[in-house]
Amino acid sequence: MRISRKWLPWGQLAATCAMRAQHVGAAPNCADLTRPGLFPNTIVQTAAVVAADAKTGMPAYCEVTALITPVVGSKITAVYRLPESWNGRMLGLGGGGWAGILNLLQPAAISGPFRAASPGLTRGYATAQTDGGHSSTFVTDASWTRNNPVAVTDFSHRAIHEMTVLGKQVVASHYGRAATKNYYQACSTGGRMGMMETQRYPDDYDGVVAGAPVYSLLVQSSSVVRDQIFKAPGAAISIEQIKLVHDTVLSACDAKDGLKDGVVTDPRRCDWEPKSLQCKSGVADSSCLTPSQVNAVNKAYQTVRTRTGVVGNYGLTRGSEAGWNPFVSTTPGPRNVLNGDLGDIVPLMFGDSGFDPATFDIEKQQAAIHRTVFAAEYEANSTDLSKFFNRGGKLLLWHGLDDPAPSPFATLDYYERTVKANGGESVRFFALPGVYHCGGGPGADSFDPLTALEQWVEHGAAPETMVATNRAAGIERPVCAWPKLPYYRSGDPSKAGSFVCR
C-alpha cells in the first residue's frame, strides 16, 4: 500500500488538545505494568518511561510492549504509549499492507496508512498499535501466511481486537480508571481492521475512522485484471503517454467544478473518451495512442462484473492517471506485489499454490474468491452494524477519489449498502477529490476526521464538512459528506471558504 507523508494536521491541534487534557499528576510507576500475571494471556516484555522531547513536541509517556497469546501458536505483539498528561481517551491505530511492522512513533518515519502514534500522543491520547500477529521487514511481505492459519486469523481480525482489549486493561491499570471513550483511526489495511472492529467486535470502540479501506479481496483481483489489461498485445503505454492521457482529461473535465486547479472533482461527470487521442493511420509515437492502447485505457476506466453481477474490478477514475504507478503497471515489465503479482496469497485466494494469476478469469473465479476460508477471515464486508450502532457507535469512512489501489467506488458501495441496512444516522462517507491512496496527489489530503468523530460521539454533532489542506500546493478545500462534493463559488481559490458543498 502506498506510503504517504500527508494525512492529518495534528500539530496545529496540539495546543488546543493540551488544554483539554486531564492532568492526572504523578502517574503510577510505569515499571509496575511488568508484574507477572497482571494481564491474562499476556507477557509484558518492557515498560519504561520516555522523557518529553522539546524539539519534537513529544510529551513524556510510559511505553509498554506486550506479547499476547490468546490461542496456541498466536504471537501478537502490541505497544502502548501512555502520556503523563492524559485526555482520558484511548486511540487504536491500524497497520498497512500485510502489516508486520510495529514500532511506529515519529511521523517522519512512516505516515499515511501506517500512521505513527505521535499525533495521538501529542493530543493526550493513550495509543495502541499491533504488528498484526507477525513480524515482517516490509509491509508488502506476505510470506508469513504460508501454512499458518493462526497468523492469518490474527492478521485478519484477532490481533486488532486483542490489542484493544489489552489496551483498555493497561490504561485502567496505569491511570487507575478506564478510558471515557475509545476511538480507532487508520487507513488502507488499517481501515479494513477498523471496519472489522465494528462488525465482529462492536463493543471495542465508540467511534471508528476507516480511510481507503482494503476491506475486500477485490483489491487483489483488480490488480490482476488491470495487469492483464496492459499486458495484452500492443496495450502497454509509456509514462509519456500516461501524462498525455492525464493532461487531456484535465483539459476536458478539470473546469467542471468551476475552477481549473488540476483536479477532476467528480470523475463521474467526466465523459472524456480515449479515442480522441487515437493515432492517425501510419503514426505510432508518444503523441497519440494506438487502437490497442485506446482499448486498454478504456478498459481501465470500466467497472467489470460477472454475468451474475459480481464485481471483479472497479474502474479507475478519470483524472487519476498521474497516480496509477506503482499500483497499475501500464508499461512492459515484471509484476510486483502491488500490481498483479499476488505472490504468497495465491494459495489462499485460489486454493492452489501453482495457480497463475495471469490466467485469472473473472467469470470463472471471482465469486469463488469470496467463498474461500481466507475471505471468511479477511473480508470486512458485513453491513450488519446493528450492535455497534445501537450502543452509540459511529463510523466515519473516507476515500481519495484518485486512489488507484482500493477503489473509492468500493467504499462508496459499502457505505450505500450500510445506509440501506441501518439508516444513515451513524455512518458518514467523505470523498476527497484529487487524493491518492491514503494521501498524496494534487488534491487537499491533510485533514482531521478524529476531531469530527469526537464531536459526533461525544456531542451528537454529525459531521457534514471538514477542511483539508495540501500544504505543498498551498490550498484548502472543504471535505463534504457524501453525496456532496466541493465546487468553486467565488473568491480566493486557495481558501476553503471560496467553495461550497453541493
Regions inferred by a protein language model and the residue ranges of each:
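Bacterial N-terminal signal peptides that target proteins for export
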Residues: 2-11
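Cap/lid segment of the alpha/beta-hydrolase catalytic domain
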Residues: 97-176, 222-223, 230, 354-377, ...
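Bacterial N-terminal signal peptides
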Residues: 11-20
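Catalytic-loop region of hydrolases
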Residues: 23-89, 101-107, 114-115, 246, ...
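Gly/Ala-rich beta-loop-alpha elbow adjacent to hydrolase catalytic centers
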Residues: 186-190, 194
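Conserved alpha/beta-hydrolase "acid-adjacent" motif
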Residues: 405-409
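Short beta-strand/loop motif that positions the catalytic acidic residue
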Residues: 397-399
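A catalytic-pocket lid/entrance helix-loop region that shapes and gates access to the active site
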Residues: 196-198, 203-305, 431, 451
